[in-house]
């Protein structure tokens, strides 16, 4: 895996990952976020595809951000925004994520989303979350990428997943969900991130997972 940008691209692609470097050159910080303890890849529910505005663009010369997305677990959609421009004039580009982007889950087989569904926008690197009521705009400086998860907010819960893995939503399975209780099957160790709304308050809760297990979370 060549760098963090390539590692995240491999994660969202849904394809195999080949470690072609010499073993002494492996960077575990880029590899471990792709896999569980047994080396099994966390994969999206379908391979990533370019967002509509990126399909017919040349990401090296467009002067714009290049965006790709894939459906991940628990109704979430994982999205990566890239600045792949090689021209010095476009070392800084602007990217926008809109709530309507989440509705593109409809285009994936057996996936569905409704326009009125509330969506949480989670920035994987900064570990910050906010409800995406309209849109969020940010800068991409240099040859770089930013990884986001768009997670549905249902009954005051949004399941993000294990932070240490690129495809966080793919690391958990929702067993049941009510207004006050959430039951999850967590597939790997790490820090589980869950968005919780209760009595008008919002909380991004971090839960330490020492072993893969079924857990019950109360508001």
What role is predicted for each listed range?
Residues 80-84, 183-187, 195-197:
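Short edge beta-strand/loop segments characteristic of extracellular beta-sandwich folds
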Residues 61, 70-75, 175-181, 208-211:
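Short, ordered beta-strand-loop transition motifs
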Residues 113-117, 187-192, 198-202:
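Short proline/glycine-enriched turn/loop motifs at strand-loop junctions of beta-rich domains
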Residues 1-157:
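Active-site-proximal substrate-binding groove within the catalytic cores of carbohydrate-active enzymes
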Residues 131-173, 192-194, 203-219:
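C-terminal beta-strand-rich structural cap/linker in extracellular carbohydrate-active enzymes
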Residues 169-187:
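C-terminal low-complexity, glycine/proline- and small-hydrophobic-enriched intrinsically disordered tails
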């Amino acid at each position: 895996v060549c760098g963090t940008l390539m590692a995240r691209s491999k994660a969202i692609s849904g394809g195999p990952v080949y470690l072609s470097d010499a073993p002494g050159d492996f960077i575990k910080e880029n590899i471990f976020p792709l896999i569980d303890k047994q080396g099994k890849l966390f994969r999206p529910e379908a391979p990533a595809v370019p967002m509509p505005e990126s399909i017919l663009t040349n990401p090296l010369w467009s002067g714009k951000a290049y965006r790709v997305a894939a459906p991940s677990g628990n109704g979430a959609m994982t999205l990566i925004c890239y600045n792949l421009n090689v021209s010095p004039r476009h070392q800084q580009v602007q990217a926008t994520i809109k709530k309507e982007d989440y509705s593109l889950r409809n285009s994936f087989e057996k996936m569905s989303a409704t326009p009125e569904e509330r969506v949480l926008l989670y920035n994987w690197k900064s570990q910050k979350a906010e409800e995406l009521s309209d849109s969020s705009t940010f800068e991409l400086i240099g040859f770089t990428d930013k990884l986001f998860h768009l997670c549905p907010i249902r009954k005051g819960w949004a399941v993000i997943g294990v932070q240490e893995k690129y495809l966080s939503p793919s690391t958990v399975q929702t067993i049941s969900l009510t207004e006050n209780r959430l039951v999850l099957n967590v597939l790997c160790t790490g820090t589980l991130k869950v968005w919780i709304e209760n009595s008008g308050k919002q909380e991004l809760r971090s839960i330490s997972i020492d072993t893969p297990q079924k857990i019950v979370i109360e508001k």
